[in-house]
């Protein structure tokens, strides 16, 4: 850790969970609009759609080009390897298997404990970097039913992390109560159509890691649950914008 990391971040610095997807890219813009120093963190857990991690550099570069102030605020990027999470997760996100729904209603893309692990490691890194604020793209409004995306889960984890690390971390989830259409609209509010275009072109959401097919909302297979949510949200966003 650089000696001046704590000084650069301090009590007002933020760490953004940054996968390279639409939600995390929007959250990064949200954080850059609010905090004077922002660092990013991605996780490699053997995910099938690892291509999303490869999009992070282009997104970071694009965001700094959109606003000089954002460029000054954007700090280092970090990547942590969590191979063990992939090894114990027999899911469609970590195995070459068809996406389906289980009897309990959860899709087999659910990786048990993923967000719990992500936020715990993020807090450990934030502790070392001297950053108080942790930003994630979890959402309870327009999601696949993942229990670790729920607001109650995040609030409970914030309490546990603060008790376990003797800190006063603040977990921010700016997308928690908005749907995908509103997420696109938030991007426009933060950075205009230029940010929307950046998210369309450079972010990746598709669970299958498909990067060959280009749609008006971005790249992906067009049929997996992630593509479906993104496509429908983009369509509703355009419709609302035209009113």
From Swiss-Prot:
Disulfide bonds: none annotated. GO terms for biological process: queuosine biosynthetic process. Pfam families: QueC (PF06508). It is an enzyme of class 6 (ligase). InterPro entries: QueC (IPR018317), Rossmann-like_a/b/a_fold (IPR014729). Keywords: ATP-binding, Ligase, Metal-binding, Nucleotide-binding, Queuosine biosynthesis, Zinc. Gene3D superfamilies: HUPs (3.40.50.620). Its cofactor is Zn(2+). The keyword Zinc applies. ATP binds at residues 18-28. It comes from the Bacteria. Its EC number is 6.3.4.20. Zn(2+) binds at residues 206, 221, 224, 227. This is 7-cyano-7-deazaguanine synthase. The gene is queC.
């Amino acid at each position: 850790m650089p000696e001046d990391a704590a000084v650069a971040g301090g009590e007002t610095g933020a760490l953004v969970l940054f996968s390279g997807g639409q939600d995390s890219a929007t959250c990064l813009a949200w954080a850059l609009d609010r905090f004077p120093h922002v660092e990013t963190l991605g996780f490699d857990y053997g995910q099938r759609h690892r291509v999303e991690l490869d999009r992070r550099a282009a997104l970071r570069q694009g965001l700094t080009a959109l606003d000089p102030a954002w460029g000054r605020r954007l700090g280092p990027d970090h990547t942590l390897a969590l191979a063990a999470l992939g090894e114990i997760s027999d899911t469609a996100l970590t195995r070459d298997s068809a996406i389906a729904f289980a009897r309990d209603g959860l899709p087999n893309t659910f990786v048990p404990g993923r967000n719990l692990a992500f936020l715990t490691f993020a807090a450990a890194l934030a502790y070392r970097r001297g950053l108080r604020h942790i930003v994630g793209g979890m959402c309870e409004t327009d999601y696949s039913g993942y229990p670790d995306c729920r607001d109650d889960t995040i609030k409970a984890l914030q309490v546990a992390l603060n008790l376990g690390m003797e800190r006063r971390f603040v977990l921010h989830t700016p997308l928690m109560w908005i749907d995908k259409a509103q997420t696109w609209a938030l991007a426009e509010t933060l950075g205009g159509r230029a940010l929307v275009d950046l998210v369309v072109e450079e972010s990746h959401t598709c669970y299958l890691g498909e990067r060959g097919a280009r749609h008006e909302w971005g790249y992906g297979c067009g049929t997996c649950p992630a593509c479906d949510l993104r496509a429908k949200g983009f369509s509703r966003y355009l419709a609302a914008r035209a009113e």
